[in-house]
């Protein structure tokens, strides 16, 4: 039976925002922790650490996020470990985010002027101390804007979780469209919600880039 697209249907989609936000936050925090490790490994003195981190980045940047979602969700099932769509989506997005954030932050670390590295070395600092007290604090300022910009992409990427059955905004829209057959109204609302989530972040990223876009020499 075909239903009308009314307030109740719109509310169902709007309520799914909490799951999109939850998934985005979990993936961003987890990806941030992993990304920091990847960035530090990419700039480590050890060649084998750099190679492992580079391989990780190439693996996740070189394959579609959709395939990564499939592999985590169905791979766990094949291995006999049942996993719900939220957990599968969180794992896949976290691993993906770690690769992208790691590369973003690697660029920020290497953007710190050579003079800062040389000054820290001249003071007798070891690599970890040099990174902790001199390099990372400066790289962090440069990295704020692109990190917020990546968060915008991450929020939009959560829509792919609908393919494994996780009911976020896009999946909620699909469910309502299947019973109302009003795709323009349904997905128009979905698009508006994504815009309302992402536009403030995009605006914030631009402001932060203007403020912290350079490293002092």
Feature locations, PLM:
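Transmembrane alpha-helices and adjacent helix-loop boundaries
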Residues: 1-217
């Amino acid at each position: 039976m075909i239903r009308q697209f009314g307030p109740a249907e719109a509310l169902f989609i709007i309520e799914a925002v909490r799951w999109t936000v939850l998934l985005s936050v979990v993936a961003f925090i987890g990806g941030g922790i992993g990304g920091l490790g990847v960035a530090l490994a990419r700039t480590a003195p050890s060649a084998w650490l750099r190679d492992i981190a580079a391989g990780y980045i190439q693996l996740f940047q070189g394959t579609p996020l959709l395939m990564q979602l499939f592999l985590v969700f169905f791979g766990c099932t094949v291995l006999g470990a049942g996993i719900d769509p939220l957990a599968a989506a969180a794992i896949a997005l976290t691993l993906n985010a770690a690769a992208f954030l790691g590369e973003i932050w690697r660029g920020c670390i290497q953007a710190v002027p050579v003079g800062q590295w040389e000054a820290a070395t001249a003071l007798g600092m070891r690599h970890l101390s040099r990174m902790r007290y001199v390099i990372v604090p400066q790289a962090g300022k440069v990295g704020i804007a692109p990190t917020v910009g990546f968060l915008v992409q991450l929020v939009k990427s959560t829509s792919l979780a609908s393919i494994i059955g996780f009911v976020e905004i896009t999946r909620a829209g699909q469910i309502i469209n299947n019973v109302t057959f009003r795709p323009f109204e349904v997905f128009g609302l979905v698009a508006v919600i994504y815009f309302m989530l992402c536009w403030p972040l995009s605006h914030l990223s631009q402001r932060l880039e203007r403020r912290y876009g350079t490293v002092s020499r």
